[in-house]
């Protein structure tokens, strides 16, 4: 017989009745019933109920053991009486009559209970993560993560991709967040950086003649934390040669759809075999298969966000023309003050009560806004109400019809410069959808966001800067960079969004040195800066570079959505807390003076910036 087990704790069934077995595991729960001790024994695979009689050798020892102690038992599989069969447990038809027990490891008093999974402060959970990971929900999340990654790998290999690894110690480069720096002992006063992403290396692989690359890549970014962001994370890093944007979409959509469908527990996933009509910002339309597509401008105008949750059916609308000629004086004044100002409506189907509208107004004030103007429509005499309706009068009916609303509905309004209020309008849309229970949470709704602006105005530095990835190909190429207002240039950049979360960003790359140098010059970076920061890749492009593109879906966020969690820490085995600390390993920590000396480093008090 094996030293520790003949079966795992999730394996035995009624067909095993009468078998002599050996099991090992943790004491999940212990109950004393009339002299008999019942134990739920747990391992990675499941639970099995044990029965110990007073005459069982070691009975007295087991009686005093705490939960989470580790034991080995020998015994016989017996069928449970029909009245005590547990249909919710795979092993619920049997139990083990224990004939011998040995304590393999006795548990001290627990700082964190495992059975029942009661809520506990995150600080305690992270400090004792090895106990937290024994809890069923978190344990399943980590197993799910493993299976999702395996599924992704299989799907990528099936499409002809090869998996390569890229360096962890590399050079610092300005890619949007702060780098984690690693001092070099062999090269005093010089530093490596941990990669924010394998961006340059994966492009260099394409220049090196490889065609379809991927890896499950570790990435490191020294940035402020939030529920869906971590200092270290993993992404499905992808790059392809000789491709257009359409080719990238066609390659990754089956992977994303397939993985979500495989692990969605029956939740519907946006189909990829249907046909959509996409209209770009210039009014040009064409049909395509796959996920729905929105331009960046459309997403901001309709949803107030570049990562819209399309489970919420509310689509905002520009209703400036209803207010431009007066009626509601405040809005007319705002519209007349600046040509770029607009009035947006946030429809609220079924929200046509004064109580709900007042509640939304109070919420807006809590968000630091002066309020939230509204109109609601009813069957009562007059047909409408609210402060805006009183001033607007009869045009209120036309406004209702233009928004596709009717009696029992409402609409909320924001006015001013959309660049300033769009984010708040998006939050209000989300709030309305949630409050009115319009969001269908039982689905995974995907879309592409395309046609991002190549550049944006950096108000702090008073200059044009890159809005996203500086290595993207501008739409229109060199001609656009030389002839267009930089703020009107769009890039071949795209995001995948699911249920309001950005799952990945990607782009068709700028593979021509002359276009790259011009793009960086437009953002205020001279050729010497580009050569210093990106000289390796720029020089490689001078020796024949294929058109290429790629993207990088975030593994942590994918698993977070599939596990129905709201924080990626719930799908990472050993995460940092929101202050960037590892409470289990006590990191970051002080190091020995000897280590600093070897690295030619002297510490100093923090400098206020």
UniProtKB/Swiss-Prot annotation:
Keyword Chloroplast: no
Enzyme Commission identifier(s): 6.1.1.23
Cellular localisation: Cytoplasm
GO biological process: aspartyl-tRNA aminoacylation
Signal peptide annotation: none
Domain of life: Bacteria
Gene3D superfamilies the record matches: Bira Bifunctional Protein, Domain 2, GAD-like domain, Nucleic acid-binding proteins
Disulfide bonds: none
Enzyme class: ligase
Gene Ontology MF annotations: aspartate-tRNA ligase activity; aspartate-tRNA(Asn) ligase activity; ATP binding; nucleic acid binding
Residues under site feature: Important for tRNA non-discrimination: 33
Catalytic activity field: tRNA(Asx) + L-aspartate + ATP = L-aspartyl-tRNA(Asx) + AMP + diphosphate
UniProt-annotated stretches for the region Aspartate: 199-202
Annotated L-aspartate binding sites: 175, 221, 468, 509
Pfam families assigned: GAD, tRNA-synt_2, tRNA_anti-codon
Record's keyword terms, sorted: Aminoacyl-tRNA synthetase, ATP-binding, Cytoplasm, Ligase, Nucleotide-binding, Protein biosynthesis
Alphabetized InterPro entries for the sequence: Aa-tRNA-synt_II, aa-tRNA-synth_II, aa-tRNA-synth_II/BPL/LPL, Asp-tRNA-ligase_1, Asp-tRNA-ligase_1_N, Asp/Asn-tRNA-synth_IIb, AspRS_core, GAD-like_sf
Record text on subunit structure and interactions: Homodimer.
PANTHER family reported in the protein's UniProt record: ASPARTATE--TRNA LIGASE, MITOCHONDRIAL, ASPARTYL/LYSYL-TRNA SYNTHETASE
Family listed: Belongs to the class-II aminoacyl-tRNA synthetase family. Type 1 subfamily.
Protein name, UniProt field: Aspartate--tRNA(Asp/Asn) ligase
Organism name: Caulobacter vibrioides (strain ATCC 19089 / CIP 103742 / CB 15)
Source species taxonomy: Bacteria, Pseudomonadati, Pseudomonadota, Alphaproteobacteria, Caulobacterales
């Amino acid at each position: 017989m094996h030293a520790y087990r003949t079966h795992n704790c999730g394996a035995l069934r009624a067909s095993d009745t009468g078998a002599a077995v050996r099991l090992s595991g943790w004491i999940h729960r212990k109950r004393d019933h009339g002299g008999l001790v019942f134990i739920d024994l747990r391992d990675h695979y499941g639970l099995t109920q044990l029965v110990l009689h007073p005459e069982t050798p070691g009975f007295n020892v087991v009686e005093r053991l705490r939960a989470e102690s580790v034991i080995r038992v020998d015994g016989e599989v017996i069928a449970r009486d029909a009245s005590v069969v547990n249909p919710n447990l795979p092993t619920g038809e049997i139990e083990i009559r224990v004939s011998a027990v040995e304590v393999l490891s006795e548990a001290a008093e627990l700082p964190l209970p495992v059975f029942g999974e009661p809520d506990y402060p995150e600080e305690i959970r992270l400090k004792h993560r090895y106990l937290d990971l024994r809890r069923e929900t978190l344990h399943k999340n980590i197993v799910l993560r493993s299976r999702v990654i395996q599924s992704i790998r299989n799907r990528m290999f099936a499409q002809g991709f090869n998996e390569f690894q890229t360096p962890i110690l590399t050079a610092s480069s300005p890619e949007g967040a702060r780098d984690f720096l690693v001092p070099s002992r062999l090269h005093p006063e010089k530093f490596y950086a941990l990669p924010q992403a394998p961006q340059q290396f994966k492009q260099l692989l394409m220049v090196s003649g490889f065609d379809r690359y991927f890896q499950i890549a570790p990435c490191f970014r020294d940035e402020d934390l939030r529920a869906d962001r971590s200092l270290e994370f993993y992404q499905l890093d992808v790059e392809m040669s000789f491709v257009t944007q359409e080719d990238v979409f066609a390659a990754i959509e089956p992977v994303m759809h397939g993985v979500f469908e495989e692990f969605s527990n029956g939740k519907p996933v946006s189909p990829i075999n249907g046909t959509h009509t996409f209209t770009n910002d210039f009014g040009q339309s064409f049909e395509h298969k796959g996920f729905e597509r929105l331009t960046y401008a459309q997403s901001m105008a309709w949803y107030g966000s570049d990562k819209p949750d399309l489970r919420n059916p509310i689509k905002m609308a520009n209703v400036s023309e209803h207010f431009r000629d007066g009626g509601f004086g405040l809005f007319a004044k705002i519209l007349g003050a600046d040509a770029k100002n607009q009035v947006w409506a946030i429809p609220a189907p079924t929200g046509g009560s004064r109580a709900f509208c007042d509640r939304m107004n109070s919420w807006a004030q809590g968000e630091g806004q002066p309020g939230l103007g509204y109109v609601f429509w009813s069957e009562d005499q007059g047909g409408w109400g609210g402060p805006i309706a009183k001033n607007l009068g009869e045009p209120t009916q036309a406004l209702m019809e233009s928004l596709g609303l009717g009696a029992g509905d409402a609409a909320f309004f924001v006015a001013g410069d959309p660049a300033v209020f769009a984010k708040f309008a998006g939050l209000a849309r989300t709030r309305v959808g949630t409050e009115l229970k319009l969001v269908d949470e039982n689905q995974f709704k995907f879309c592409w966001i395309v046609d991002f602006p190549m550049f944006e105005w950096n108000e702090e530095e008073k200059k044009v800067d890159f809005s996203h990835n500086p290595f993207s190909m501008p739409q229109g190429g060199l001609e656009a960079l030389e002839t267009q207002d930089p703020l009107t240039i769009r890039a071949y950049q795209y995001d995948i969004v699911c249920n309001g979360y950005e799952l990945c960003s990607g782009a068709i790359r700028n593979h021509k040195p002359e276009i790259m140098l011009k793009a960086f010059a437009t953002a205020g970076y001279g050729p010497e800066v580009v050569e210093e920061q990106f000289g390796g890749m720029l020089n490689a492009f001078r020796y024949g570079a294929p058109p290429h593109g790629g993207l990088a879906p975030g593994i942590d966020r994918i698993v977070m959505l599939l596990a129905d969690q709201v924080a990626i820490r719930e799908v990472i085995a050993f995460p940092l807390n929101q202050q960037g600390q590892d409470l289990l390993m006590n990191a970051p920590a002080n190091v020995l003076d000897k280590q600093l000396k070897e690295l030619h480093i002297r510490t100093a008090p923090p400098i206020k910036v």
